[in-house]
Amino acid sequence: MSNSQKNVLGEDLEECSKNPLTGWFRDGCCNTDENDRGLHTVCVKVNDEFLEWCKEAGNDLITPHPEFGFPGLVDGDNWCVCASWVARALEAGIGCSIYLKKTHLNTLKLVPIETLKKFAIDLS
């Protein structure tokens, strides 16, 4: 893993969340490597609609699983979500707030930058 991973804007990747502690490496960032098959690369500010949709679709982000270092999420938490789940949610019409500066460049393999920008909350 590189120490200077990039975001979807081509800049240094910013921290997503330390509380709850997120990331494939549980380092607070949406860093990734070849072992991250799910591409946990999109920094999302989750909301109840997104969490409920994910749970109903088979990806329960609400229930804590301490054995995996997963605290369970609530409305307003920031979390590194799998790019494929974000793509599915957006296709289903489920909106979520996305931080582009905190979202890893590899996300663009699954979700176009134009789509991400529609839901971005950190563009000025």
Annotate each predicted stretch with a short phrase:
Residues 1-49, 113, 120-122:
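Extended boundary segments
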Residues 45-60:
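Short, basic/aromatic beta-hairpin or loop at an interaction surface
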Residues 86-109:
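Short, compositionally biased
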Residues 104-124:
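Glycine- and charge-enriched low-complexity intrinsically disordered segments
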Residues 62-69:
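Short alpha-helix capping/helix-loop boundary micro-motifs
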